[in-house]
Amino acid sequence: MIPASAKAPHKQPHKQSISIGRGTRKRDEDSGTEVGEGTDEWAQSKATVRPPDQLELTDAELKEEFTRILTANNPHAPQNIVRYSFKEGTYKPIGFVNQLAVHYTQVGNLIPKDSDEGRRQHYRDELVAGSQESVKVISETGNLEEDEEPKELETEPGSQTDVPAAGAAEKVTEEELMTPKQPKERKLTNQFNFSERASQTYNNPVRDRECQTEPPPRTNFSATANQWEIYDAYVEELEKQEKTKEKEKAKTPVAKKSGKMAMRKLTSMESQTDDLIKLSQAAKIMERMVNQNTYDDIAQDFKYYDDAADEYRDQVGTLLPLWKFQNDKAKRLSVTALCWNPKYRDLFAVGYGSYDFMKQSRGMLLLYSLKNPSFPEYMFSSNSGVMCLDIHVDHPYLVAVGHYDGNVAIYNLKKPHSQPSFCSSAKSGKHSDPVWQVKWQKDDMDQNLNFFSVSSDGRIVSWTLVKRKLVHIDVIKLKVEGSTTEVPEGLQLHPVGCGTAFDFHKEIDYMFLVGTEEGKIYKCSKSYSSQFLDTYDAHNMSVDTVSWNPYHTKVFMSCSSDWTVKIWDHTIKTPMFIYDLNSAVGDVAWAPYSSTVFAAVTTDGKAHIFDLAINKYEAICNQPVAAKKNRLTHVQFNLIHPIIIVGDDRGHIISLKLSPNLRKMPKEKKGQEVQKGPAVEIAKLDKLLNLVREVKIKT
């Protein structure tokens, strides 16, 4: 703390006090006159002269103390420095500025003791000091010898024999004294503990070698595509073909055969197709890379995104739209079938056709991959609409297809051509009505491939691939029970039931279910073709889908155009659960990860997700996933990833990700391990069904 007078110079300027006595004395001395005595001079008063504009402060203000605070900021440091950022492409201000201010610098000549240079200088000083000490010792020994010489002369004659030995000893001592002692060189330790060593590996000498291959010849080609140039090219090609034909005729028959074989192997068409195949493979890889960059945000959502809002709502979930698949060639066709590949989890097959019998045209079979949503991996076209399909479990490259005209076919994805490898015909027993569903089954006893089909003609047919031919066997013929018509001749005709859907039991190999257009569901057996095991009065309209539960062996599900979805126990003829979705149901599918979760799609464009373990009465997700005028036709769960694919009647396929609430797993309890597996899923569904079974049995 310092006084205000010294602290605030701007408030009180320097005072100029002039002593009148001293001034008069000085002037009197100069003039040589005397004014008074010395005692009178000191007693005289002194007046202070102030400038007229000086600030006058009170005593309290003068005694006020001010505190000065020293800061490390440099007042002269610039505050507006900017630098160019190449990352953002703009000038960015620099927030941190060096505050160092140098007031005084002086170059010194002091060297630190611990530095290398300081150690070397100290070593040189020790050498100089040692040499000086040795010189002093030599001079002192010389003086001593001079003093001892008289004593040596006074020695007795009898001691003459010891003179040579003494002289030799004196010479040794003189040599030792003359050679200065070299102090031991101390190893200078590096304060950074750094050691530099050369590499012990052998460096190969650099050699210049010329390239032994000749560069391919280069030619510059330029032309314009005109009508006459194209015509000339065709004429030249025709002449070449005629010349080759003439040469073949001139050859002998043996040479002709060998020439034909060689030409067959090396024809221009085959070489061109090989080049096109290689080019198509490279183009497919490039297309996938471009699509992965284009749809990177969707791929990130597919892999990592989960709806965080599910933490705050227990019984409600959402569907996140991901990729959308469509093709220009299938614009006006409906999605009639969906099926995931059992081996390649990102690949799924789509069947295109039409459900309107007045607008029947061509059909298509496309296989899409999640890695390339812009274009299908495989594309096959047919003259009739594709109504159903199924992919073999053990041979994922074989696709069984059912057509609207009643034919069934097998497509081999390994073969490049677009025609089916095997196809039925009128001679081989094709259906007379549309084929609504096909299912691969286990191979027969001779290890022949086998699949089943159901059609509106009432026949359930087993197709076996024997010697590259499709051989059919009618397993069962559907008949409407209790309804017969009499003809004038007195004969009775039994109406044929129209099969629309079927599904085989997962464990009981011979048992399967069949849904019909009349709304009935028949439990059938492969061993009995004349009668049904059981009949269920399921729906009031056509049964669109029948599906066994993947975990529980007694439970199956059905849906219909009468707006309902029903869950059944095949030992009870009445449904366990009935759900009214207020619109025609196109398809239902069980979830592969839970026995209580299933999905349904309706013609009003909505997807419904149910979880019986959370809510037995209504869906936990009702979400529109298509445009208002689009009707949803099919839905399928992925076997591993938490996504579903949905198809509509405009040829669009939409992939949707399930939120965490739609795929809840059992919660972990303290001190207990989470139980997983089919047994847990069966017990979970049994717990729900037991409550309903008791009521059904009582009634």
Swiss-Prot record:
Start and stop residues of the WD repeats: 320-370, 375-413, 422-465, 474-526, 531-570, 574-612, 618-658
Tissues expressing this chain: Expressed in respiratory ciliated cells (at protein level).
Localisation per UniProt entry: Dynein axonemal particle; Cytoplasm, Cytoskeleton, Cilium axoneme
Phosphoprotein found in the keyword field: yes
GO terms assigned for molecular function: cytoskeletal motor activity; dynein heavy chain binding; dynein light chain binding
Chain residue ranges for the region called Disordered: 1-54, 140-170
Keywords: Cell projection, Ciliopathy, Cilium, Cilium biogenesis/degradation, Cytoplasm, Cytoskeleton, Disease variant, Dynein, Kartagener syndrome, Microtubule, Motor protein, Phosphoprotein, Primary ciliary dyskinesia, Repeat, WD repeat
Main location: other
A single Gene Ontology CC term: outer dynein arm
Record-listed Phosphoserine modification sites: S131, S134
Subunit note: Consists of at least two heavy chains and a number of intermediate and light chains. Interacts with BICD2. Interacts with CFAP45 and CFAP52. Interacts with CFAP53.
Function: Part of the dynein complex of respiratory cilia.
Illness the protein is tied to: Ciliary dyskinesia, primary, 1: A disorder characterized by abnormalities of motile cilia. Respiratory infections leading to chronic inflammation and bronchiectasis are recurrent, due to defects in the respiratory cilia; reduced fertility is often observed in male patients due to abnormalities of sperm tails. Half of the patients exhibit randomization of left-right body asymmetry and situs inversus, due to dysfunction of monocilia at the embryonic node. Primary ciliary dyskinesia associated with situs inversus is referred to as Kartagener syndrome. Kartagener syndrome: An autosomal recessive disorder characterized by the association of primary ciliary dyskinesia with situs inversus. Clinical features include recurrent respiratory infections, bronchiectasis, infertility, and lateral transposition of the viscera of the thorax and abdomen. The situs inversus is most often total, although it can be partial in some cases (isolated dextrocardia or isolated transposition of abdominal viscera).
Family: Belongs to the dynein intermediate chain family.
Name under which the protein is recorded: Dynein axonemal intermediate chain 1
Source species: Homo sapiens (Human)
Lineage: Eukaryota, Metazoa, Chordata, Craniata, Vertebrata
Gene: DNAI1
